């Protein structure tokens, strides 16, 4: 699906942290119904890119623009961007001691409901909603009573991130190395959740080092990032080429 305007358009974006310029004239267009993979060596700017999209306050925009559904989001804080439909799955999900997963997820869900001028849901109604979503990431309802990410395995933390994405029904999801540290079984579960969630009204950005995630989640485009900009774009075959050749041949 290719709508008249991109769901996300990044124009000549320059961004820095502590006066260190990391993103350098970055350009990218993503339409609804598309999955884009972003690959690149360590230090290429991939994680900075994801945090800048989500509105992380540590990063400063030097020039350029980020348009989401045709409107600039540079002046919006992370919560506003989230309510508009942007979701970031962290590479290293944080633990929140003393807060149950169910309470955390219900708070996030009701916060978005309020933003959309929809009725908030009570705990009983929410349990019915979340129970259906749990099945998509192969998790037991027992998981809801545990504190957020506390004592979770790496795979459980990543599944929890995908669960949040599904629950919030985000239009643009940025998955920052969601596949890192996963065994093959966990990778398959995560991929199933992503593929079930994806449709023609959504777009996903996969940030990854490895081809293996792309064996299960088929991207429409693969971009290579180096030194803060996209230096090459191709199909899923580009990821396979990178797997066999590395990044040196692109220099």
Swiss-Prot record:
Residues 8-250 form the ABC transporter domain. It comes from the Eukaryota. It is found in: Plastid, Chloroplast. Pfam families: ABC_tran (PF00005). PROSITE patterns: ABC_TRANSPORTER_1, ABC_TRANSPORTER_2. CDD domains: ABC_FeS_Assembly. ATP binds at residues 40-47. The keyword Nucleotide-binding applies. Disulfide bonds: none annotated. InterPro entries: ABC_transporter-like_ATP-bd (IPR003439), ABC_transporter-like_CS (IPR017871), FeS-cluster_ATPase_SufC (IPR010230), P-loop_NTPase (IPR027417). Keywords: ATP-binding, Chloroplast, Nucleotide-binding, Plastid, Transport. GO terms for molecular function: ATP binding; ATP hydrolysis activity. The keyword Plastid applies. GO terms for cellular component: chloroplast. Belongs to the ABC transporter superfamily. Ycf16 family. This is Probable ATP-dependent transporter ycf16. The gene is ycf16.
């Amino acid at each position: 699906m290719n709508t008249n305007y991109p769901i996300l358009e990044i124009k000549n974006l320059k961004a820095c942290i502590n006066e260190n310029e990391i993103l350098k004239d970055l350009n990218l267009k993503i339409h609804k119904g598309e999955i884009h993979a972003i690959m690149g060596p360590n230090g290429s700017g991939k994680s900075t890119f994801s945090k800048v999209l989500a509105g992380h306050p540590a990063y400063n925009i030097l020039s350029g623009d980020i348009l989401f559904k045709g409107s600039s989001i540079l002046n919006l804080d992370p919560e506003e961007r989230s309510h508009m439909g942007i979701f970031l799955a962290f590479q290293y999900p944080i633990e929140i001691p003393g807060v149950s997963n169910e309470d955390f997820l219900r708070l996030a869900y009701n916060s978005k409901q309020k933003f959309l001028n929809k009725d908030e849901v009570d705990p009983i109604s929410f349990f019915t909603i979340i129970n259906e979503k749990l099945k998509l990431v192969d998790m037991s309802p027992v998981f809801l009573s545990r504190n957020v990410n506390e004592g979770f395995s790496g795979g459980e933390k990543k599944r929890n991130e995908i669960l949040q994405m599904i629950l919030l029904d985000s239009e643009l999801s940025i998955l920052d190395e969601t596949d890192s540290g996963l065994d093959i079984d966990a990778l398959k579960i995560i991929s199933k959740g992503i593929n079930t969630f994806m449709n023609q009204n959504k777009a996903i950005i996969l940030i990854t080092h490895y081809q293996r995630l792309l064996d299960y989640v088929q991207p429409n485009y693969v971009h290579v990032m180096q030194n803060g900009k996209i230096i090459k774009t191709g199909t899923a075959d580009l990821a396979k080429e990178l797997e066999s050749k590395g990044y040196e041949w692109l220099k």
